[in-house]
């Protein structure tokens, strides 16, 4: 599929683009002329299909008013379940195990409220010190709601190098006092993929429920939840899945737990045929829809309709194949062109451990990111010293990767970054 072996030339980049089986999808996206967008791991670009589905849902409001809940091309009342079914193949789940609902953080609160049942000596939640802050805030909050002290009952696995986690260390931390585990599938800084299959098996061997935050993996790597028997998962849809800023998130619950009442119940937790009976006793849905809380945010959900059509056409296996190749290409090019400028590669080099973005460490990272933006390359800064670059399989080209590395080389060689302050903006 892709030209080998690596060559650091512009011509090689063009050859790779020529052989790219996914190249036709680039025209599906709005790409600003003169800009190389390498921040799809924070916010994916708008596609024409996502735009169309948003406008379609707006038109249904205009056309049907209240009847839009049951009329039109995409009736709102069933939309969350429909999109959950379309998302299920991306995580290797059954259609009824996936639901599009809430936000990442509200969904964390939901699954923790549902699965965290401290009793006896099992009172602690296991997480890690490198996870995204919102996960920790939610876990601390849920522990306090149980009348417990987060300082004592939230265990965070330490990193040996400040970048990655050892699965052996995580397993060693699965002690008899652990009631629940929440871990990232892919670390948001270093892009390390955790071995979800192994960790799930080890947790279950010890009688512990385990779930994963998929924000940096869904739409980028394949998942096999049915095979792995993961208990629950949550994710956002606005990164690799291109659902737009504030796009509605997703939630997975293993079907073996469908008899478990949601920790946070609401009107849309109800079975559809019972919802408008207006009873004060909840008859929960017999699928992942039970873990919805409130009325779905229809207009924030709409772009995902078109976006998931693209993923169905492209196929997650093909997307992963290109992602691995284009990130490997970028790593090779960085090593070839930037080795004299003080950069350290912070993400794993092994294919099976590397997610969809590159993580460079540099003491001047914040001002380097500003210089890149000034030169038309959109990166992502992560404190304290990280530059994240995400060549997304659906819409980035090898030519863009080559150009961005050459721009970065010029910035470093000419010390252009020194004209900027070495501190982050309000939104990094």
Swiss-Prot record:
Keywords: Hydrolase, Pyridine nucleotide biosynthesis, Pyridoxal phosphate
Pathway: Amino-acid degradation; L-kynurenine degradation; L-alanine and anthranilate from L-kynurenine: step 1/1; Cofactor biosynthesis; NAD(+) biosynthesis; quinolinate from L-kynurenine: step 2/3
Transmembrane annotation, as ranges: none
Entry's Gene Ontology BP terms: anthranilate metabolic process; L-kynurenine catabolic process; L-tryptophan catabolic process to kynurenine; NAD biosynthetic process; quinolinate biosynthetic process
GO molecular function terms listed in the Swiss-Prot or TrEMBL record: kynureninase activity; pyridoxal phosphate binding
Binding residues annotated for pyridoxal 5'-phosphate, in chain numbering: 104-105, 132-135, 213, 216, 238, 267, 295
Domain of life (superkingdom): Bacteria
EC number, UniProt record: 3.7.1.3
Cofactor: pyridoxal 5'-phosphate
Cellular component, GO annotation: cytoplasm
Enzyme class label: hydrolase
Modified residues (N6-(pyridoxal phosphate)lysine): 239
Reactions the enzyme catalyzes: L-kynurenine + H2O = anthranilate + L-alanine + H(+); 3-hydroxy-L-kynurenine + H2O = 3-hydroxyanthranilate + L-alanine + H(+)
Function of the molecule: Catalyzes the cleavage of L-kynurenine (L-Kyn) and L-3-hydroxykynurenine (L-3OHKyn) into anthranilic acid (AA) and 3-hydroxyanthranilic acid (3-OHAA), respectively.
Family from the record: Belongs to the kynureninase family.
HAMAP family for the chain: Kynureninase (MF_01970)
Subunit and partners: Homodimer.
Name of the protein this chain belongs to: Kynureninase
Organism: Bacillus thuringiensis subsp. konkukian (strain 97-27)
Lineage of producing organism: Bacteria, Bacillati, Bacillota, Bacilli, Bacillales
Name of the gene this protein is made from: kynU
């Amino acid at each position: 599929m892709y030209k080998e072996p690596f060559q650091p030339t512009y011509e090689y980049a063009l050859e790779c683009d020529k052989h790219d089986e996914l190249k036709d999808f680039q025209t599906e996206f709005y790409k600003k002329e003169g800009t190389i967008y390498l921040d799809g791991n924070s916010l994916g670009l708008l596609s024409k299909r996502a735009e169309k589905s948003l406008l379609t849902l707006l038109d249904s409001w205009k056309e049907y008013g209240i009847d839009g809940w049951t009329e039109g091309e995409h009736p709102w009342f069933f939309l969350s379940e429909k999109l959950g079914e379309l998302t299920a193949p991306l995580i290797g789940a059954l259609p009824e195990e996936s639901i599009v609902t809430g936000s990442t953080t509200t969904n964390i609160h939901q699954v923790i409220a549902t699965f965290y049942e401290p009793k006896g000596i099992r009172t602690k939640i296991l997480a890690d010190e490198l996870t995204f802050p919102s996960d920790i805030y939610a876990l601390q909050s849920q522990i306090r709601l149980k009348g417990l002290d987060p300082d004592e009952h939230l265990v965070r696995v330490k990193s040996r190098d400040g970048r990655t986690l050892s699965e052996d260390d995580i397993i060693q931390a699965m002690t008899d006092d652990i009631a629940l585990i929440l871990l990232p599938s892919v670390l948001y800084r270093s892009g390390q993929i955790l071995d979800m299959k192994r960790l799930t098996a080890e947790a279950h061997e010890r009688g512990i429920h385990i779930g994963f935050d998929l924000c940096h993996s869904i739409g980028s790597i394949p998942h096999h939840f049915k095979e792995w028997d993961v208990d629950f998962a949550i994710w956002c849809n606005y990164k690799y899945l291109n659902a737009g800023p504030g796009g509605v998130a997703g939630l997975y619950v293993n079907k073996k737990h469908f008899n478990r009442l949601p920790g946070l119940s609401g009107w849309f937790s109800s079975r559809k045929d019972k919802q408008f009976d207006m009873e004060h006793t909840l008859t929960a849905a017999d699928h992942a829809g039970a873990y919805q809380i409130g009325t779905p945010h229809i207009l924030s959900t709409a772009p995902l309709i078109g976006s998931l059509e693209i993923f169905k056409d492209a196929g997650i296996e093909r997307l992963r194949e290109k992602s691995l190749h284009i990130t490997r290409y970028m790593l090779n090019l960085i090593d070839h062109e930037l080795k004299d400028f003080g950069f350290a590669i912070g993400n794993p080099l092994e294919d099976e451990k590397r997610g969809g973005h590159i993580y460079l460490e540099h003491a001047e990272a914040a001002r380097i990111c500003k210089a890149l933006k000034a030169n038309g390359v959109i990166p992502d800064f992560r404190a304290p010293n990280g530059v994240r670059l995400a060549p997304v399989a659906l819409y980035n080209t090898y030519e863009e990767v080559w150009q961005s590395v050459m721009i970065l080389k010029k910035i470093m060689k000419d010390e252009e970054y020194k004209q900027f302050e070495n501190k982050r903006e309000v939104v990094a």
